[in-house]
Amino acid sequence: MPLILLPAVDVVEGRAVRLVQGKAGSETEYGSALDAALGWQRDGAEWIHLVDLDAAFGRGSNRELLAEVVGKLDVAVELSGGIRDDDSLAAALATGCARVNLGTAALENPQWCARMIAEHGEKVAVGLDVQIVGGKHRLRGRGWETDGGDLWEVLQRLDSEGCSRYVVTDVTKDGTLAGPNLELLAGVAGRTEAPVIASGGVSSLDDLRAIATLTGQGVEGAIVGKALYAGRFTLPQALTAVRE
């Protein structure tokens, strides 16, 4: 299977934006979220990674808009951002998205997270936002503002609960165009049977080709954001590169 590419649409107040290292206030705006998503669909995307940054940072939500975007797309959507209780999860699933990503909730409310994994199976993935500090792999929560514990311990727990998929971000790379952390991706994929989706740092077609070499180890897809918006390459070029 070729590497699956998921163009990212990060939403703040209804607009598509990109952040640098996930920091609020570092946004660059790229127009309406719906237009951005439809554009990626037109360019051949099979998946869209749709993120409610307002909900992730706990400052409101774009729930109605996200439901509208999912409804107008013909491709699969992975929905993320601020999904941390029954209400927000139900609303996310009600949009008709293919799956949701739990982030902070997996760290702050492990019992709830385990229950959602058991109830919803393949429809729930867990986002692991990793910061490597002094050689230690720490998880970050609440829009990367809080410490969420040791990556390997949390991964072992989630695996034992049957988590179906992980979205792995190196926080120091995201939105920086600094290249993906291949060592981290291979490390996570090597410790779990569940597929892994790479996120953060992709800056070139060579970066995507490098991630694509990990498909045999369990890396199934890559989320691409800033590089596409900054015009480093087009989505059709990227799709060709990972299928070579």
Swiss-Prot record:
SUPFAM superfamilies, per database record: Ribulose-phoshate binding barrel (SSF51366)
Keyword Nucleus tagged: no
Domain of life: Bacteria
Subcellular location(s) per record: Cytoplasm
E.C. numbers: 5.3.1.16, 5.3.1.24
Annotated family: Belongs to the HisA/HisF family.
Job description of the protein: Involved in both the histidine and tryptophan biosynthetic pathways.
Name the record gives this protein: Phosphoribosyl isomerase A
